[in-house]
């Protein structure tokens, strides 16, 4: 009985709270029907239908969709991350139907992303900040826009792996262990296999995230103000030692996702993609005005040139306030001990 009691005592009740709070975000998905009017709602069903045709034909990775492009076919999953569709296909084969499978994956993406964020922040800062971060991550306005306005299946699933990649980077930088490097590699590969766009955006942020963590860790062991000409070279060597496992994990992640990433990068010139970047999709016409980040306006339309978009770009009052509070430790003389917890 003692081992069972110890296992029960180790269970974190906040996990249940994260799942319960996720119901506020996924409640509409639990109701009958399907949001056909959302931006990519039809596309998600079409993609799954074509993907299933390939699976039923015995093709484990169906890159070619024969019914697209007016029946001429199109290598859609050669350039579009297939992981979210693989998960939807599993639920379809279990009998959920096309629309049911898409709704299940959208709902699970919210729950899983909250649990992933909770695990990451708990490791760094503890349970209470982790619970706040997880709930905020699940219900920030953009996540709700992604689900109920854009119906962006792949992007919604990608946000499961964002905190896992951050967790992997933090763990690999704080302790040189094989499991940390492998975990980072699989998280980064899964993100690439889900959404190359989110991967690109996160990678740009990772540059600053990794630099800040590495410099902070190096400063703890060798304060910058004590650097001399003689100690500079050993300091740089130590900095490289800290960065090596992170770089190795990210490189291995790219290698693991090469089955998708390599054809996507080398063969995209053979596929017409200009219609994705021109006309109404031209990104140069969709820069957001500063006030739109704080505007409470909510719409179900699309982004148009100028500030009169019929879709929300708000950051959300609560996330902004929490972000400002998160900056307070920077003004303390002594950093929080939680940031140096072993990985």
Give the role of each language-model region.
Residues 201-253, 330-338:
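Perimembrane helix-loop-helix junctions
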Residues 17-25, 77, 104-124, 128-215, ...:
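Membrane-embedded helix bundles of polyisoprenyl
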Residues 1-29, 235-245, 340-342:
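Start-transfer (signal-anchor) and selected internal transmembrane alpha helices
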Residues 6-7, 66-69, 94-103, 126, ...:
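Membrane-helix interfacial "entry" motifs
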């Amino acid at each position: 009985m003692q081992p069972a009691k110890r296992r029960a005592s180790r269970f974190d009740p906040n996990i249940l709270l994260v799942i319960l709070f996720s119901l506020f975000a996924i409640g509409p998905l639990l109701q009958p029907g399907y949001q056909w009017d959302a931006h990519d709602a039809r596309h998600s069903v079409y993609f799954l239908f074509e993907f299933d045709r390939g699976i039923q034909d015995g093709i484990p990775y169906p890159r070619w969709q024969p019914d697209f492009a007016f029946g001429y076919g199109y290598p859609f999953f050669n350039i579009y991350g297939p992981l979210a569709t693989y998960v939807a296909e599993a639920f379809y084969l279990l009998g959920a139907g096309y629309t049911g499978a898409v709704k299940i994956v959208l709902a699970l993406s919210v729950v899983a992303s909250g649990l992933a964020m909770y695990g990451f922040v708990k490791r760094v800062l503890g349970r209470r900040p982790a619970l706040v971060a997880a709930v905020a991550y699940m219900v920030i306005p953009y996540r709700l826009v992604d689900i109920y306005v854009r119906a962006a299946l792949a992007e919604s699933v990608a946000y499961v792996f964002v905190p896992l990649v951050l967790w992997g980077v933090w763990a690999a930088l704080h302790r040189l262990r094989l499991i940390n490097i492998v975990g980072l590699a699989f998280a980064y590969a899964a993100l690439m296999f889900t959404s190359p766009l989110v991967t690109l955006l996160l990678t740009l942020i990772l540059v600053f995230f990794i630099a800040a963590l590495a410099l902070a860790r190096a400063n703890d062991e060798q304060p910058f103000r004590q650097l001399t000409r003689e100690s500079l070279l050993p300091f740089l060597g130590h900095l490289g030692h800290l960065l090596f496992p992170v770089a190795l994990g990210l490189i291995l992640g790219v290698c693991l996702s090469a089955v998708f990433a390599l054809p996507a990068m080398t063969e995209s010139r053979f596929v017409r993609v200009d219609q994705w970047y021109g006309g109404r999709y031209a990104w140069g016409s969709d820069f957001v005005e500063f006030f739109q980040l704080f505007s409470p306006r909510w719409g179900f339309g699309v982004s148009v040139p100028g500030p009169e978009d019929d879709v929300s770009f708000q950051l959300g009052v609560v996330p902004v306030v929490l972000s400002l509070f998160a900056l307070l430790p920077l003004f303390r003389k002594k950093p929080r001990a939680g940031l140096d917890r072993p990985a």
